[in-house]
Amino acid sequence: MKKFISFLYLCCLTLTVTAQTDTNLLRAVDKDKMNHWVDSVFDTMTLDERIGQLFMIIANPATGSKNIQRLTRYIDEIKVGGILFSKGSPQMQAEVTNRLQKASRVPLFIALDGEWGLSMRLSGTTRFPRNMTLGAIENDSLIEMYGREVGRQCREMGIHINFAPALDVNSNIDNPVIGNRAFGEDPDWVSDKGLAYSRGLESENIISVAKHFPGHGDTSDDSHNTLPSIYHNRARLDSIELLPFKRYIRGGFAGIMVSHLYVPALDKTKNTPATFSVPIVTDLLQTELGFQGLLFTDALAMKGAVVKKDENISVKALQAGNDILVSPATPVNDFGAVKEAIEKGKLDLKDIERRVIKVLKYKYIAGLHDLKPVETKGLTDRINTPHAAWLAAKLNEEGITLLKNTSDFVPLKGLGKKKIAALSLGDSRGNEFQKMLNRYDSVAFFSLGRNAKDAEIKKVYAELETFDLIICGIHTVRIKETESLRKLAGKKEVVLAFFTQPYFSKDYKESINEAKAVMMAYEASPLAQKYAAQLIFGGIAAKGKLPVSIPGMYFAGTGIFTEKTRLGYHEPQEVGADMTRLKAIDAIVEEGLAAKAFPGCRVLVAQNGMIIYNKSFGYYNFDKKQRVTEQSVYDLASVSKAAGTLLAVMKSYDEKNFTLASKISEYIPELKESDKKDIIIRDLLYHQSGMTPTISFYLNAVDKDSYSGSLYSSSKSATHPIRFDAGTYVRNDFKYLPRLVSDTVKSGFETEVARHFYVHSSFRDTIMNEIKKSRLGPKGKYRYSCINFIMLQKMVENQTGQPLDEILRSGFYDRLGARTTTYNPLKTIDTMRIVPTEDDPFVRRQFLRGYVHDEAAAFQGGVSGNAGLFSNADDLAKVLQLFLNQGIYGGEQYLSPETCRLFTQSKSPVSRRGLGFDKPATGTPKLSPCGALAPPSVYGHTGYTGTCFWVDPDNQLIYIFLCNRVTPTRANNQLGSLDIRTRVQDAIYKAIDRKNQKNL
C-alpha cells in the first residue's frame, strides 16, 4: 500500500513538474542572448537595486512636477523597478516615461491598468468597449484583434505590461466592483474571451496579466474598501472561479495578479487575503497549477490588503510567493522592511534573487535591453489610427444584444405611418442615441434627468401619449422604473434600450414585459448609443448574446438575431476602404473652398449599404456665420429629375400605366393637337425628344409696358446694370403684371414663387401652353431638356390624380424615413437648416432660402418635374440605396427588380444618357459628367446648384456631393472649372481599389 501511495505521489509530482513550463513569451526569446543580458545587469546590481526591481509605484503625471520629483526620488532611494501610471494624456505620460527611464540605471517596467485599453487611464485615446460588451460578441477573432491593437498602442506608449484581462466569472448580480469588467458568468465563455484577448496582447510582446486570482466574481464587497470573502468549496472553485485561470496558465501566458480575497476553502487562516497566502500563491498557483510567469499583487494600498499590526504588507506578499509589489502605500518604509526581512532571514535572499532574475528576463522580453525613448512627435495620431476607430466601432456593433422582439418589431417598418419619440432617462436631449435615431426618421426628443421633479415627469409622459412609437433609452441605474413608463408601454409601441449593466434591467421588469422590443447596449458610450440606434432601424444586424443571466427574465446566451435592412454608419475600414486615401477628398474640397467655388458642402460615400464617409465642410454662405452640418438641407436642382420625378415614373411603369413606346399625348391631352403628340416616353427619358432645353416661363408674367428695350444684354450698361449669368446682364426696372403676380397670398394667388411673391393659379395653364407651342427640334438626337421632365410630371399627375410631391411623399420619402427629401421645405423644415442659394437680382429680387432656385420650378409653386426637390445627404442616400437594392429598402418593396434594372441599366443608342439617369461618357471622357475611374455601369445626375449623385452597381457604391455654388451668384462656375465633383469621385475609387488596400 505504501509503495502504491509513493507511486501516486511520484505521478502527481511528475504531472506538477510537467505543468511547470515556460510561458509563450519566454519560449519565443533567444535564451542565450537573454541570459547574457540578464547576467550582465544582475551581476552589477547592488542589493538595494535588486530589491527595488520588485516594487512598482503608482504615478499620476497629471499632478505636475512635485509628483515627478517624488518618483525620481523613489528611483534614487529605493531603486524601484516599475511604474504604473494612473491618469493623464498620452503626451504627458510619454514625456514622464522618458524622464524616468533616463533617471533609472536599470530600465523600468511601465505598466497600464487598462482593462478596456488606454482610454481607461489616458484621455484622448480610442474608447474601446468594456468587457461585458466584449462578452456578448461571438466572434473571438475580434477579441484577439482587439488585444493586438491594445498591445500595439501600448508599444507606442512605451508600456510593457497591461493588467488585463479580468478573468473573474461574474456570478453575483450584487458584485459592486466587477460588473461590466467581466466577460460574463460562464467560465468557459470567460476563458475563451480572456485567452483571445491575451493572445492578441502578447502577440505585440506586451505582458498580459490576468486578474483577479483566484476569482473576484462572486463577491458582494469591494476589495478597494474592505476584504471580500468567497465561501465556496474547492469543487465549486475548480469548476467556476479557477477554471479560466487554469486555461490561461495552460495557454502559456505571462502574468497573473493576485487579489485581496479571503477564500477559506483555499486557506483556512482567518481573514487572510489571497495576496498574502502561501497556500494560494505558492502551493496552488505555482506548484499545483504550474504557473511560472510573473506574479503581481493587486494594489497594496487597497483596504482589502490587511495584515496583522506587527506585519509588513510587502514582506507578507513576498513571503506568499508574489514577484512584484504593486502600489504599496508607503514604498520607502516597505522597501526598508523587505531589506530588513532579508537580513534577518525572514525572506530568503536566494529566493528574492530568483525573482529578480525572473523580472529581468521579462524586461528583456519586453525589449528593455534595447530601450529607446518614446517618440512623442505624432504620438496621438499613431495611437488613434483609422484601424483603431474601426475596431472600436466593430466591437460595439457586434456586441449590441436584442433580448426581445415581439412579432419581429425591429428592424422598424412602416415608417411613414408612425409618429416617433425618443425618451432618454438619465441623459440629455439630443444625445448620440437620439441623434442617430433621427438620421433614420423624424424623431422628437425628450429626456428626464436623475433629479427630475414630478411635474416635469408628468408633463413629459403626457406629451409622449401623442406619439405612436416611443424609443426609450435608459442611461443610468439611478432612475427606476415608473408607473408612467409601465402604463405607456402597455398602451403604446415601446422599444427599450439599456445603456447600463444588464443586471439593472431587472428593475424594469414590468415595462420589459409590455415592450415590443428590448435591447442591451451594456454601456452609455457614444459608440454604444450610435449602434443601438442603428440596430433599431436595421442599419446593422443584431448579433450579440447576453453574457450574464438577468434573474427571472433572461438566461445567459439569450440573443435574437436580425438582418440588416437599411443603410448603416460605419468606419471606412469596414468595407476595406483606405481612410488615408479618402482624405484626398478633404484636400480637393478645401481647394474648392479656398477658391471660393462654393461656401460649403456635404460629401457622402456609401458602399455595400454602409455610409463610410459623411463629412460637412465650410459654411452656408461666404460670411461664415453658419456651419454646414449633417442636418443641412440643399436645393438639389436637376438631381430632382432622377431622385424625384423618375421615382414616380418608375412606379407608374411598375403599375403598367404606360410603356416606354407610349406617346406622351395619351396622358397629356393638351398635346394631342400639337407637334408633340407623337413624342414617346422613352425619348423624353433619353432626352432625345427634340424639346427645347428650357422655357423662361416667368416672361409671361412680366409687364412689357413697364420698360423699353430688351430685358437682357451681353454687356453691362446703365440700363442693364446687373450680372445675371456669365455673359448676361439684365435690367431691374421692369414690373410684373398685377393680374398674374401678387406680393400677398389671396384668392387665386396661392401659388408661391418666393417670399412675398405669388402667381395666379391660371399660370399653370400658361406653362402648359408655352410647352405646347414651343419649338420642336429633330427627334432622335440628344438635346438635354428640362421640359422633358415637366411633361413626365404632368403624365404621372394625370395618371394618379395626385400632385407630384404627394405621390413621392406618401409613396416613397415618408416610408423611407427621408423626411428632408421634400419639395417646398419651408412647410416642414426649420429655415435655419436650409442652405441658401442665389441672391436673385432679377426674377425674384431676393436672397433665396428654402425657395427653389430654378425659375421654371418656382413658377409652378416649387413642385416641378425638372427641379424643386430639397434634401440632406443622408436622406438622399436612402433613395439611392433603394435603387441599388433593386427596389427594396427597410424590408419593404417599393419597385420591382425588373423595373429597377431596366431604368438603371438602359442606355440611349445615340448618347450617354440612360432612362432618366445620366451616365459616363465612356468614349469621350473629357465630356463625361463622371470621374475617369467610374465604370460604364454608373448612373446618376448633376444639379445646377452644385449637386450630384452617382450610383455604381458594380462596386455597390453611392457618391453624393451637395453644395450651393450659386451663392451668392450663379455666375460662379469655378466648381466646374476646377472639376471638384469628378475629382472627388476619382478619389473615392482610388480609396476603394482593393489593390491599394492593406489587410484589416
What residue spans do the PLM features occupy?
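Short, conserved catalytic-motif segment at the N-terminal edge
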Residues: 575-636, 657-659, 768-776, 847, ...
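Short, surface-exposed loop or secondary-structure junction motifs
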Residues: 677-936
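Short active-site loop at a secondary-structure junction
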Residues: 584, 595-602, 624-687, 775-788, ...
